């Protein structure tokens, strides 16, 4: 297996223009495909997860042109649901939850038979709450291997709407997927959320993009969503993909630990992504943060431990776990049960790897506490085919200790040139 050893970084300083957001890119691509008219997406993320979505759309008959650097995509929308004349068209979606879940819902609207599959880890990531909701709305979906998990076989029969319950406690992607399909149902859909809805800011991203594509939804305090029937997505013409706020977290944290200062552009006060709130968590730890409409600047600060509920920003919360290695006291990251069903079981993985560098760690069912050692140890970090594990643990190099990252290429899921960008900021 390939590995990368990062030598100690004495200072971080500079500016980074963020790659496009994964969450925004894949949502916008799907809606552009369903819309009538042409959409030009700019600052599209070039990564594995986006490639899986693009490959699926091509197989589904969507005509698009991708620029040479893969950041501009012109999509000629179908103006209707997907159709397949191939018997059981198979779509391989890697480990891309942002492709698997929304496509599972969207394909129920169309005509034909579809099989959705992916990498072994994808077959361990739950999808049962979404499938149950789709079936309640009239969909024909079956599990091909294990109950509640991909791969799925879908027969396009349309969605009839009605009253549907969705469990919101594991992943907001189930609700996102259903919301994006519901406007094309034959009857009005009322979606009732069962349990506490996790990652609410990701639902805001979904609703914002749907509105941009001309669809109306009534949100009743995130408990009930009413979606009028027989709507159509309309191409907005130009669509700028915001920078990826989760990806910004590593550079903002690096500046807080070892700045100088770092300015990240592509997100800011006007961002639709909840993960920009990571900067508030850094500020609570003692970093100095400046906000613009489309940029955030972080300066070095004396960092102290925090005890915080991170249910709203679970992805960016991972960066707090390794930032905690540089903070005084014990940091507690709470209410992140859904770490367990992400690219890997992130609570177990994070606890294991933090202990390798010398931290004292308590891993609970839905929380983790981290007490840093007096001095970090040089360790070889396993990344579990999880892009965020690799990027989070790169921050260890901001100490006086090197760090070795196994399988650094796993960052290609969302940020293929992450380590190059980190090097550019290292003084």
UniProtKB/Swiss-Prot annotation:
GO terms for cellular component: cytoplasm. Disulfide bonds: none annotated. 3-phosphoshikimate binds at residues 22-23, 27, 171-173, 199, 315, 338, 342. SUPFAM superfamilies: EPT/RTPC-like. The active site is at 315 (proton acceptor). Catalyzes the transfer of the enolpyruvyl moiety of phosphoenolpyruvate (PEP) to the 5-hydroxyl of shikimate-3-phosphate (S3P) to produce enolpyruvyl shikimate-3-phosphate and inorganic phosphate. This is 3-phosphoshikimate 1-carboxyvinyltransferase. It comes from Aliivibrio salmonicida (strain LFI1238). The gene is aroA.
């Amino acid at each position: 297996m390939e590995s990368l050893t990062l030598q100690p970084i004495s200072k971080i300083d500079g500016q980074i223009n963020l790659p496009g957001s994964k969450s925004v890119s894949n949502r916008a691509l799907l809606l552009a495909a369903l819309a009538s008219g042409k959409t030009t997406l700019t600052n599209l993320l070039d990564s594995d997860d986006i490639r899986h979505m693009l490959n699926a759309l091509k197989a589904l008959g969507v005509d698009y042109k991708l620029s040479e650097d893969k950041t501009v995509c012109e999509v000629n929308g179908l103006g209707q649901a997907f159709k397949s004349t191939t018997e059981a068209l198979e779509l391989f979606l890697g480990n891309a939850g942002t492709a698997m879940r929304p496509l599972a819902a969207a394909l129920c609207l169309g005509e034909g038979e579809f099989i959705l599959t992916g990498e072994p880890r994808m077959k361990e990531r739950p999808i049962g709450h979404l499938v149950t909701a789709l079936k309640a709305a009239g969909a024909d979906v079956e599990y091909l291997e294990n109950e509640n998990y991909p791969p799925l076989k879908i027969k396009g029969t349309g969605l009839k709407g009605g009253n549907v319950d969705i469990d919101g406690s594991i992943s907001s992607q189930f609700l996102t997927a259903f919301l994006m399909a519901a406007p094309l149902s034959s009857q009005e859909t009322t979606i009732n959320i069962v349990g506490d809805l996790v990652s609410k800011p990701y639902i805001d991203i979904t609703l914002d993009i749907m509105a941009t594509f001309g669809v109306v939804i009534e949100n009743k305090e995130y408990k009930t969503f009413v979606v009028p029937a027989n709507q159509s997505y309309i191409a907005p013409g130009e669509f700028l993909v915001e920078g990826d706020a989760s990806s910004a977290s590593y550079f903002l944290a690096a500046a807080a630990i070892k700045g100088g200062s770092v300015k990240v552009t592509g997100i800011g006060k006007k961002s639709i992504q909840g993960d920009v709130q990571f900067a508030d968590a850094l500020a609570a730890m003692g970093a100095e943060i400046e906000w613009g409409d489309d940029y955030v600047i972080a300066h070095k600060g004396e960092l102290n431990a925090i005890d915080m509920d991170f249910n709203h920003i679970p992805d960016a919360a991972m960066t707090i776990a390794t930032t905690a290695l540089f903070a005084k006291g014990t940091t507690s990251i709470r209410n992140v049960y859904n770490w367990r069903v992400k690219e890997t079981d992130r609570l177990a993985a994070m606890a294991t790897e933090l202990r390798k560098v010398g931290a004292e760690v308590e891993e609970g069912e839905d929380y983790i506490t981290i007490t840093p050692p007096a001095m970090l140890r040089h360790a070889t970090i396993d990344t579990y085919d999880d892009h965020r594990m690799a990027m989070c643990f790169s921050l260890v190099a901001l100490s006086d200790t090197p760090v070795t990252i196994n399988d650094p290429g796993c960052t290609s899921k969302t940020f293929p040139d992450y380590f190059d960008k980190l090097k550019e900021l290292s003084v």
